[in-house]
């Protein structure tokens, strides 16, 4: 895995061999960021990637956050509850010189607290497939007021999973790649 674009373009991202870890592929990450930067649905909203604060739920290796930071995002909060993956996140952040732009919380992505009253412009939600965690994690973000009015939520789910619907969100774009479905939402 590597950073696709921005100030750290071409730098490698470390992962681990673990059957429970499913890092987003370079191709899928590139597609998501092309939509975030060039997609007409996103351009017509008030969202901009540059300077945004993001939250990465089920952060894994942190590759999504590191790609966003390389492309000009301001700060990232990564939520991950696997200690081995948290070590990988810190190794990657150190290697990419992003330690001062990230915060990592070892907490459950479906119930963590926003003690610092952070507000986010971008949320990336990539729960383990087949565990029905998407709705709970996104509802936690909404319930605790963690999203700015112009926030974009990117949800990755397995294609065969029943699509998540949210009364508080508008689905503005979907993209299927391989076995993954990417849904882009904004607050209503």
Question: Predicted regions span which residues?
Answer:
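Class I S-adenosyl-L-methionine-dependent methyltransferase catalytic core
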Residues: 1-188
